């Protein structure tokens, strides 16, 4: 494969990963609403833990109206802040009302960003042409007229299209289930998780289809396909017993983080360092899906994150053992296959650190969790190697120049006299950045720094008045473009960086 083809494939991979990140940014902030709806449905509907006719009436409107509107608002807000979100929610009512018996999550995921983009373009056209003194009139009427038009478009045009798409997808899923072929989906899902497509598959396909199934059947097996912690646990237990060196030593902590914390990316490097282990996770995933399919098991709401604790909380009444069996059998099969591979195949020269770098490169960004598998010296060496790699294309080189211009790795080069707010930013604004912000808050508390607030957010939601932004190096250029007037600091990983101690000294 030529260098040009390699760069094109790499660019395509990053675009797909970015698309998955955008879908995640619409769904993940609303997972709490899914969980609240799931609790209400699991507890109060007929056949629930404590059936209650009055309270069970909450479940239908929540999944039919509330959650699609929240998703549409989130999608519109990502494109054009609150104004885009509000009109996106208004327009989505057209799709919802046209198909009241089908949870319009997919429709909301399309309408939200689309209307947000249209609102942005409308404002860009109208605002420069608005007479002085008529700003409020033009702003309100332009938004109202766009909402009016797009609501009708949603009702008359998008709704029939979505009805057809949902029908085809539902038939495909049902056909796989009835033919007992749904486990074959793991052949795609498990490798995709380890590369970069997990967000696009889980939040773009399984969550909306699962919500549709759960609304009609009371539960959905689709919520278990990507989230089952069993295959990853089997891999890590195999390393605990048959692994060597760093991989064996770190597998114990990784197992806890993965199984109880639900952060699956922690086991990805262990698979990448022995590519034959893809077979183990695929067979483990297929086993879990087959088990749940045979037992007719499913969840009422998304199991996010994919933690065994979440699985226990989501398990329907009377089906706790079925839930455990699906996780256990998936872990056992994955463990057996992984153990055979580790025991009887030749160990490659590639180590855990190199595999971690490969995973991060394929995802197009650093991982704060998997970076715990690497020490300070290895991280610094990785950073140096990455910055001097001959495979970097012109775009990456321009990104490096941008970071140099902002002096993102020299903490002492900036003036912190007016800084009272530090923001950690990542793709979705919920996972790694939340852990980094929590860690820095603890450091500030121990150092007696009480007048500096530390929060986290998604990069595309950084406020325009941000003062100090901390991002992983691969994402810093995006943060700079979002808020060019802020101080930007790059770190190799959120949980382990010498930059924090330097920052403490400057803020004291």
UniProtKB/Swiss-Prot annotation:
Which residues constitute the catalytic centre? 426
**Residue ranges occupied by any PTS EIIC type-2 domain in the UniProt entry:** 19-351
Residue segments, region Disordered: 355-400
Kindly give the InterPro entries that the UniProt entry links to this protein: PTS_EIIB-like_sf, PTS_EIIB_2, PTS_EIIB_2/3, PTS_EIIB_mannitol, PTS_EIIC, PTS_EIIC_2, PTS_IIC_mtl, Sugar_PTS
EC main group: transferase
Q: Provide the membrane-side ranges marked Cytoplasmic in the record.
A: 1-30, 78-141, 194-280, 343-508
List residues traversing the bilayer: 31-52, 57-77, 142-163, 173-193, 281-300, 321-342
Q: Where in the cell is it found?
A: Cell membrane
The identity of this protein, by name, is: PTS system mannitol-specific EIICB component
Highest lineage ranks of the organism?
A: Bacteria, Bacillati, Bacillota, Bacilli, Bacillales
């Amino acid at each position: 494969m030529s260098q040009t083809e390699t760069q094109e494939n790499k660019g395509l991979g990053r675009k797909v990963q970015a698309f998955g990140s955008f879908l995640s940014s619409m769904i993940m902030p609303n997972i709490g609403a899914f969980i609240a709806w799931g609790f209400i449905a699991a507890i109060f509907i007929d056949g629930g833990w404590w059936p209650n006719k009055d309270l069970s009436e909450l479940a239908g409107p929540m999944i039919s109206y509330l959650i699609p509107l929240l998703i549409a608002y989130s999608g519109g807000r990502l494109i054009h802040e609150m104004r885009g979100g509000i009109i996106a929610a208004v327009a989505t009512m057209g799709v919802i009302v046209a198909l009241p018996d089908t949870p319009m999550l997919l429709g909301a995921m399309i309408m939200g960003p689309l209307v947000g983009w249209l609102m942005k373009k409308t404002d860009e056209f109208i605002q420069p042409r608005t007479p002085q003194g008529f700003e409020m009139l033009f702003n309100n009427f332009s938004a109202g007229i766009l909402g009016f038009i797009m609501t009708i478009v949603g009702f008359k045009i998008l709704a029939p299209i979505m009805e057809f798409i949902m029908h085809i997808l539902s038939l495909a899923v049902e056909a796989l289930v009835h033919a007992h072929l749904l486990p074959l989906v793991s052949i795609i899902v498990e490798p995709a998780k380890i590369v970069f497509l997990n967000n696009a598959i889980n939040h773009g396909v399984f969550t909306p289809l699962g919500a549709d199934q759960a609304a009609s059947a009371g539960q959905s097996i689709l919520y278990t396909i990507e989230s089952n912690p069993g295959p990853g646990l089997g891999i890590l237990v195999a390393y605990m017993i048959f692994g060597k060196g760093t991989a064996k030593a770190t597998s114990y902590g990784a197992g806890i983080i993965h199984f109880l914390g639900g952060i699956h990316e922690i086991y990805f490097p262990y698979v990448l360092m022995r590519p034959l282990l893809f077979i183990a996770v695929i067979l483990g995933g297929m086993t879990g899906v087959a088990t749940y399919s045979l037992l007719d098991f499913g969840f009422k709401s998304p199991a996010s994150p994919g933690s065994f604790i979440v699985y226990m909380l989501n398990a329907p009444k009377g089906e706790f053992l079925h839930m455990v069996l699906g996780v256990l059998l998936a872990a056992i099969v994955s463990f057996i296959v992984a153990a055979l591979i580790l025991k009887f195949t030749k160990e490659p020269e590639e180590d855990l650190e190199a595999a971690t770098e490969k995973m991060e490169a394929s995802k197009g960004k650093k991982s704060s969790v998997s970076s715990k598998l690497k020490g300070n010296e290895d991280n610094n060496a990785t950073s140096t190697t990455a910055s001097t790699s001959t495979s970097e294309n012109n775009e990456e080189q321009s990104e490096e120049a941008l970071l140099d211009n902002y002096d993102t790795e020299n903490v002492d080069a900036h003036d912190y006299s007016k800084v009272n707010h530090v923001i950690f930013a990542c793709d979705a604004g919920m996972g790694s950045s939340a852990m980094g912000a929590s860690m820095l808050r603890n450091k500030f508390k121990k150092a007696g720094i009480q007048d500096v607030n530390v929060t986290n957010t998604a990069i595309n939601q950084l406020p325009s008045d941000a003062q100090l932004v901390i991002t992983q190096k691969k994402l810093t250029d995006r943060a700079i473009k979002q808020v060019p007037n802020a101080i930007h600091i790059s770190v190799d990983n959120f949980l382990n960086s010498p930059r924090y101690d330097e920052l403490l000294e400057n803020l004291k």
